[in-house]
Amino acid sequence: MNPIICAASVIGAGLAIGLGAIGPGIGQGTASGKAIEGLARQPEAEGKIRGTLLLSLAFMEALTIYGLVVALAIIFANPFV
């Protein structure tokens, strides 16, 4: 195996998971903060806000999992080797 390709694959995998987690992390923080603000304004809408928040957090977390899958594919099923 070419050491340059191996090193580039590891760096690419690190970037894939690192950059793939930044956006969802920021989005989850923003969504959680806005949900808390909504609960503070309308406590009677707790169930609806919580359900919507959990669903949106699951979709955001899926993006991070896609980054993990890409990183694992780059490391273990490298098409360049």
Swiss-Prot record:
InterPro entries: ATP_synth_csu_bac/chlpt (IPR005953), ATP_synth_F0_csu (IPR000454), ATP_synth_F0_csu_DDCD_BS (IPR020537), ATP_synth_F0_csu_sf (IPR038662), ATPase_proteolipid_c-like_dom (IPR002379), F/V-ATP_Csub_sf (IPR035921). One of its GO terms (molecular function) is lipid binding. GO terms for cellular component: chloroplast thylakoid membrane; proton-transporting ATP synthase complex; proton-transporting two-sector ATPase complex, proton-transporting domain. It is found in: Plastid, Chloroplast thylakoid membrane. The chain crosses the membrane at residues 3-23, 57-77. Gene3D superfamilies: F1F0 ATP synthase subunit C. The record marks E61 as: Reversibly protonated during proton transport. The keyword Plastid applies. CDD domains: ATP-synt_Fo_c_ATPH (cd18183). It is a multi-pass membrane protein. Keywords: ATP synthesis, CF(0), Chloroplast, Hydrogen ion transport, Ion transport, Lipid-binding, Membrane, Plastid, Thylakoid, Transmembrane, Transmembrane helix, Transport. Coiled coil: none annotated. It comes from the Eukaryota. Belongs to the ATPase C chain family. In plastids the F-type ATPase is also known as CF(1)CF(0). F-type ATPases have 2 components, F(1) - the catalytic core - and F(0) - the membrane proton channel. F(1) has five subunits: alpha(3), beta(3), gamma(1), delta(1), epsilon(1). F(0) has four main subunits: a(1), b(1), b'(1) and c(10-14). The alpha and beta chains form an alternating ring which encloses part of the gamma chain. F(1) is attached to F(0) by a central stalk formed by the gamma and epsilon chains, while a peripheral stalk is formed by the delta, b and b' chains. F(1)F(0) ATP synthase produces ATP from ADP in the presence of a proton or sodium gradient. F-type ATPases consist of two structural domains, F(1) containing the extramembraneous catalytic core and F(0) containing the membrane proton channel, linked together by a central stalk and a peripheral stalk. During catalysis, ATP synthesis in the catalytic domain of F(1) is coupled via a rotary mechanism of the central stalk subunits to proton translocation. Key component of the F(0) channel; it plays a direct role in translocation across the membrane. A homomeric c-ring of between 10-14 subunits forms the central stalk rotor element with the F(1) delta and epsilon subunits. NCBIfam families: ATP_synt_c (TIGR01260), PRK07354.1 (NF005608). This is ATP synthase subunit c, chloroplastic. It comes from Euglena gracilis. The gene is atpH.
